[in-house]
A protein has these predicted regions:
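Short, ordered loop/turn segments at secondary-structure junctions
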Residues: 10-13, 101, 211, 293, ...
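Duplex nucleic acid-engaging cores and interfaces of nucleic-acid transaction enzymes
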Residues: 6, 19-25, 32, 36-290, ...
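Long, highly charged, low-complexity intrinsically disordered interaction regions
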Residues: 9, 28, 34-52, 62, ...
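Feature marking long nucleic-acid-engaging regions of large polymerase/nuclease enzymes
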Residues: 2-17
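A glycine-rich phosphate-binding loop feature that marks nucleotide/adenosyl-phosphate handling sites
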Residues: 154-161, 291-295, 349-354, 374-381, ...
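Structured, non-catalytic alpha/beta "coupling" segments that mediate domain-domain communication
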Residues: 46, 60, 71-74, 198-213, ...
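Single-stranded RNA-binding regions, centering on S1/OB-family and related RNA-binding modules
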Residues: 515-519, 523-688
Length: 688
């Protein structure tokens, strides 16, 4: 089928111009429903193979709206491990259990009935043995009842309480959860993930509870017929089935569902943070120094030109244990003067604070130089990769990391696609989540960002090209190989000469690949080749030509289309109105980059310490991470401050992402500073 970016961009008429995020949600739901259909059929077949599928059960399975409902219906027919109930069945006690469970009006005395099932050879030596076995069978029937499970699940969700307690009193990051209770329905995702981690590390004991007075009466009403001879016996079996089998099973399910919901929320949060990180505005065309701080191995430096090409590298040792500060300053000054360096990108890892202080001090003598702290997460992973050794042969692993840090400032998207998105580290508990699901979600975000920006067909790396709609790692490498062997591409149609890139792949990828050097200006726009005729017809109708596109002479294009009528113009061009609007946008700004419309990266020239902060100070910072309970903001003191969700705005919001994104430049007011614990509390709403 078609790829999500292609559908989102070039098939707007068919889906009402939904964005890629909404289309991915639809795809997810479609996959769930397909899996549900598949599971329904599997369950029906499995029950039919046992000869137990009747019309009523078949209809119930067909009507099940969730996988959990299907599994509840299948539960009584599943192959089970050896249980007390299966042992009782082996002793021939199932007919007795069925008779007692029916609680017929004219039923004989239960002990008299049980006496008929004595069988010392099978271990049924007394009436008590027979009744105990029958009770075990009834308890399991209750635990396997789809309706009982549905009712209890609903009750636990509505009235259950999750509690955690300390296994040991030693201090830990889980102290908040040493004596914790919260209604199941009110559990926050970050609480669930923290408690799970504490339990896995042996620091917390966790349980879910619900009052017997809430849970048992509905089950008793469901299974016990008051006034019948076997009523008390069945009631006792219901209570046993509830406490021994049904509740522990539902407790596990509820906790699994809480975890699944928390994982899904955290994955969405990670994706939400990753998107603006990838879409940070590039700082193009400036000579940049990448500075990878360190201690024992020194601080690695790499100078790259405006296109990211490496000009020089060095290692300095201003930090412990060497403390060669003056020699480091001399080397930095020499590089700045020699290459006219304008920006310095400092990695935010080990020794970053000392490095920032050194750079801020040094550039007081160089008024045109600015620095910025760059998220270096994943840079070391990239620098040790096969890709890095191919791109930067002859450079030490540590120096490659400095090159990557410089390029991350120049073009964050082009550089970050070389790293596994999971390694970029802008999420909560990312290592505790289902890794396949996390990878799928994050790859989707990277794909959407890359296609939103597009890629230069003649300069893009295989890593960047592999995220373009329709392309794979193999076709991306084939494009680069073709480029190396035949020189640059001059037309989009040349893509069809690339091995393993046929018409179908061309249709998916062509609109997202730009060729600034092409003789056809449309090849450097987001206009798809299938719409070139429509674009040319539009220009003709409005009294323009392709030459006007090159000279940016289409300032009145929108107004002329409005005069002609958008719907009528679209019809004359043979496209829908949404496609016409996109063509107009592209013709007015050929080669446009959506990232250029965002606030520019905040470059600094001086540094502050946490001790310099005072409550009431108003500062400008950059949002580094958005989480469920707030956002962390870099205010230039080497310790990100926390803006709690209650301090973001005066109006009610469910999640900080409704207002903030990673990379946003915000004004904040300092509320509180704890130097010892290195905690800074900030407010956005009080800074206004």
């Amino acid at each position: 089928g078609n790829t999500i970016p292609f559908i989102a961009r070039y098939r707007k008429e068919q889906h009402g111009a939904m964005d890629d995020t909404k289309l991915r949600e639809l795809e997810e739901r479609l996959n769930y429903l397909r899996n549900l259909d598949k599971r329904r059929e599997e369950v029906k077949s499995a029950i039919a193979a046992q000869g137990k599928l009747d019309g009523e059960l078949s209809a119930a399975i067909a009507a099940a709206k969730t996988l959990a409902e299907v599994e509840d219906l299948y539960r009584p027919y599943k192959q089970k491990r050896r249980t007390r109930a299966t042992m009782a069945r082996e002793k021939g006690l199932e007919p007795l259990a069925e008779t007692l469970f029916k609680q017929a009006k004219d039923m004989a005395d239960i002990r008299e009935l049980a006496g008929k099932y004595l069988n010392p050879e099978k271990g049924v030596e007394s009436i008590e043995d027979a009744l105990a076995g029958a009770s075990d069978i009834i308890a399991e029937l209750i635990s396997d009842s789809a309706e009982a499970r549905r009712q209890l699940r609903r009750i636990v969700w509505q009235r259950g309480v999750l509690s955690s307690a300390a296994v040991t009193e030693e201090d830990s990051v889980y102290r908040l959860y040493y004596d914790f209770s919260q209604a199941v329905s009110k559990m926050q995702g970050h609480q669930v993930l923290a408690i799970n981690r504490g339990e896995n590390e042996g620091m917390l004991k966790v349980s879910v509870a619900v009052a017997d007075a809430d849970a048992l009466p509905p089950l008793v009403r469901m299974f016990v017929i008051p006034g019948r001879r076997a009523a008390e016996f069945v009631r006792s079996a219901v209570e046993d089935g509830y406490s021994r089998l049904l509740f522990p099973s539902i407790e596990r399910e509820i906790r699994a569902e809480l975890t699944e919901n928390a994982d899904e929320g955290a994955i969405k949060n990670f994706a939400l943070n990753l998107r603006p990180l990838l879409m940070q505005p590039p700082v193009r065309g400036r000579v940049t120094l990448g500075y990878d701080p360190g201690y024992r191995n020194g601080c690695k430096l790499a100078v790259v030109d405006g296109t990211g090409k490496v000009l020089d590298t060095a290692v300095i040792y201003p930090t412990q244990p060497f403390n060669k500060v003056e020699a480091a300053k001399r080397k930095l000054s020499e590089l700045i003067k020699c290459y006219n360096i304008e920006n310095i990108a400092i990695g935010n890892g080990t020794a970053s604070r000392e490095s920032e202080r050194l750079v801020a001090e040094l550039i007081r003598d160089f008024p045109g130089v600015r620095y910025v702290i760059v998220n270096e997460a994943g840079a070391s992973v990239y620098s040790a990769s096969k890709l890095a050794s191919e791109e930067l042969p002859g450079y030490d692993v540590n120096l490659r990391s400095a090159v990557s840090i410089a390029r991350r400032l120049q073009d964050p998207l082009a550089e970050l696609v070389k790293t596994d998105p999971k390694a970029i580290g802008v999420g909560q508990y990312q290592h505790d989540m289902p890794q396949a699901r996390l990878s799928e979600a994050l790859s989707g975000v990277v794909e959407d960002c890359v296609n939103s920006v597009g890629a230069d067909l003649n300069t893009a790396s295989p890593s960047l090209l592999s995220y373009i709609a329709g392309l794979t790692k193999t076709t991306a490498k084939n494009i680069v190989k073709y480029r190396e062997e035949n020189g640059m591409f001059h037309k989009r149609r040349e893509l069809l000469k690339v091995p393993k890139l046929g018409p179908r792949t061309f249709e998916q990828c062509a609109g997202f690949l730009r060729i600034p050097e092409s003789g056809d200006v449309l090849d450097n726009t987001g206009v798809h080749p299938e719409s070139y005729a429509a674009a040319e017809r539009l220009l003709e109708l409005c009294g323009y030509s392709l030459t006007d596109v090159i000279s940016s002479g289409l300032s009145e294009l929108k107004e002329r289309v409005e005069k002609l009528g958008r719907a009528e113009t679209a019809e004359k061009c043979g496209v829908g109105v949404p496609t016409l609007d996109d063509i107009i946008k592209e013709l007015m700004k050929p080669g446009r980059d959506p990232r250029d419309e965002l606030p520019p990266t905040l470059l600094r020239s001086d540094v502050m310490e946490i001790k310099d902060l005072k409550p009431g100070m108003i500062l400008t910072g950059t949002v580094r991470n958005v989480i469920d309970f707030g956002a962390f903001v870099d205010i230039g003191v080497h310790q990100d401050g926390l803006v709690h969700i209650s301090q973001i705005t005066d109006r009610f919001i469910r999640h900080p992402s409704e207002i903030l994104s990673v990379g946003d430049i915000v004004k904040v007011c300092v509320l509180e500073v704890d130097e010892k614990k290195k905690r800074i509390s900030l407010s956005i709403k009080q800074a206004k």
